[in-house]
A protein has these predicted regions:
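RNase H-like nuclease module associated with reverse transcription
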Residues: 2, 20, 38-159
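RNase H-like nuclease fold core
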Residues: 5-48
Length: 159
């Protein structure tokens, strides 16, 4: 049993301030146990940056969630890395490679904490196809069928 994270971002969703939307959730034993949808505090210059900022925020929450569930005895060990799924290849590359990329030099240093988590083996950032990114409904409206599919993947049951 392990906690798995899903992260997504919608770029430039607010026409007034040009900020993006972050969404992430964590699933344990087939049920969403923690989630968040919020406007980012910075103006991202690209979709990749918005996704990277979201992944960084999710990684901090994910490590707390992992430690919390271990302390409760739900998960036996914190030694295995937590998997966080992201649908943006550029954001995944930024998280995995602790070197400066030409198009990401402007990203604020505080978001590079995810690189440290990956380097230490606390987190593994993996690619998920956008159609299977369970965090999608936390960042944008979806067609009903897709929304219901994601709710089912979250373990949410309609009564």
């Amino acid at each position: 049993m392990a906690v798995k994270g899903y992260v997504d971002a919608s770029f430039n969703t607010d026409p007034d301030d040009s900020k993006s939307q972050t969404g992430y959730l964590f699933i344990l034993n087939g049920v969403a146990v923690s989630w968040r949808s919020s406007k980012q505090s910075i103006v991202a210059a690209s979709t990749c940056e918005a996704e990277y900022v979201a992944a960084s925020e999710a990684s901090r929450e994910g490590l707390w969630m992992k430690a919390f569930t271990t302390d409760l005895g739900v998960i036996p060990s914190t030694l295995d890395p937590m998997e966080i799924y992201c649908d943006n290849t550029g954001a995944i590359a930024n998280a995995r490679e602790p070197r400066s990329h030409k198009n990401s030099k402007h990203i604020q240093l505080r978001y590079h904490i995810i690189r440290e988590y990956v380097k230490k083996g606390d987190i593994v950032v993996s690619k998920v196809h956008t159609d299977h990114n369970v965090a999608d409904p936390l960042t944008k409206p979806l067609p009903q069928e897709k929304h219901e599919k994601h709710l089912e993947a979250m373990g949410v049951k309609m009564l």
